[in-house]
């Protein structure tokens, strides 16, 4: 059936070459057809559609008409123009999971990282070049004559709400543009007005590190396209399906990451821009929080340090950074070495013996695998943790997946049989009969929803059937935990603090997470607008009391933004002192935080 649909699309594109509509160019014709496909995809499969209508005032029909009119506004549009229109069309959803990537290589960047302080100023926190008039700690005042806030406003999506996460996304794009994400890519020189720590103000001229486009524009080759000729002896051959097990393109096989992550990750690698401020960086940007008395030599940045409380007593505290839940993307990962979840377990076992509390840094985390997330969480509790449920958009795709799972697990009645069918673990989550029963329950719920017509934002269902995360059979950290979060925590990194907070298992501090609240599905389809992939949200996660994560994010128990001093001098001393004070309270007050009437501690 899928092959038939692909053939139909190919025939449609072929006929479009030779049958111009209303005098439109070939590029415009193709873009209009691709826009129509994406509109249908949103109508059928985009779970937050109703939520976006309520939250943003977004309307699919109006948005589609606007994009169509914009495509037709150019007499002979370039492919890049059409890509920007389509990127804006999906970008209007204000959804970190939803986006389009393109087959394009044009890009430009400046080797700087900028961070905003709690008083609204912008500071350079990393300079990734040896030849620059800009220094770490300089304040950024203007970009090509525009105040920074105005420059960022030009980079927001259509329906932005001005959240910290949206502002961080614009700030990330300020010095890094990629045509593969539908950006307009600058070249040449740019003027940055900066203020030194001495107070002096200076204009600095910087040159974009520019890579030109080398994928030829369809508009330039369209006149040369010839009608295909088939020889009579040619026969069609359909590829045989390699496996009887259905390979879904949606729920079970797509990582939960923001739409831009793949392109940015590739940009980090190819540009050589190694920085602790990069999303997913192993070490992160915090300095060590005290004298290190033990440190891991593996792929996790982890150590133990002594924390002295206000009474002069010393307590050993563990620190571990979780840079990503996409464990296969971890830096320095040895594919034939110890899996990350096993190394995490060894560290947590040591922390259980040697520490009185644990600090987990998951700032700037792009998300990843939900089962890996569950696996790590299973080691941080001795009691089951309740999980958010998901309201799903169901298609035949999920129905066939459900049938496959039931077929696989049909005769599983013991722990041993569960492990034979599924393995000893699923990306770190220990497998037993309970896990198999969860998966079977999920399959039955999907089939019941389909049978009852409950397919448009279904009754809330536990993702994969997992109603709870059960404690790991061997590794269980039971002491106080403090989790550090920020507005660049996406998807699984939204769920991690949500689960710990909703179960009263950890103190969550920092700033509100990004709010990418659902599972992700990716779609590739034949096209000549250069669309590589479209990523969309396939569910709406619902927390306890009916709270959503999408667009809302996860609010910390205690908000601790970065001050100007934290950022300017990169020591984050004021932030760290507050975290240390809170952790000392957790240790001394049996995990209870005492706040004064004004909310201070």
From Swiss-Prot:
GO BP field: proteolysis; signal transduction
InterPro entries, alphabetized: ClpP/crotonase-like_dom_sf (IPR029045), CPAF_PDZ (IPR041126), PDZ_sf (IPR036034), Tail-specific_protease (IPR005151)
Any one Gene Ontology cellular component term annotated for this protein: outer membrane-bounded periplasmic space
Family: Belongs to the chlamydial CPn_1016/CT_858/TC_0248 family.
A GO term for molecular function: endopeptidase activity
Protein name listed in UniProt: Uncharacterized protein TC_0248
Pfam families the UniProt entry points to: PDZ_4, Peptidase_S41
PANTHER family listed in its UniProt record: CARBOXY-TERMINAL PROCESSING PROTEASE CTPA, TAIL-SPECIFIC PROTEASE
Record lineage: Bacteria, Pseudomonadati, Chlamydiota, Chlamydiia, Chlamydiales
Native species: Chlamydia muridarum (strain MoPn / Nigg)
NCBIfam families per record: chlamy_CPAF (NF033424)
Organism domain of life: Bacteria
